[in-house]
Amino acid sequence: MASLVECGVRMGGNAFSPVLLAKGELTPEEAAGAKPFSGPDGAALKASLKALGYAPEDWETLVAVDAAGAPLAPDLMRLAVATLDPATLICCDETATQVVRDAYAEELSGLEDLNEALLPAGMVAYVCGMRFLNLGGFAAALGDPRQKQVMWARLKQVPPLAEPY
């Protein structure tokens, strides 16, 4: 973990948790160094995961961009995901999704369903033993009641794999 931090990877929460929340579109506060997911998006995601049956300690976070806002290199993103070892990777925005697409391009290209391989918003893909879900703009959806319902429907596709909390 320390070597990832030395490489500029920002992460938080409990390592080896079943859910990894990745984001690449940071708030101004997060870009200035605030804890990722410390705003309304983090509160809403945590409440949603709890409602699905995840225990409060069952998620961790990963920022898909470096301090300058550039996407993490594919090998670094892949190393971070492998180190954190989630069962489910939830990409909260298109930036994070693109970094994941780049990091897992070979595995995604091997999927039988081309649509699934593109990681479109709302579709769950199974890659390297993990469930990948692209929420497609979670933070932006919080201001629109209809879009919040869409996000909730998407999150319901990835319930806990074990007994609910």
Language model features by range: what are they?
Residues M1-Y165:
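A polyanion-binding, active-site-adjacent surface
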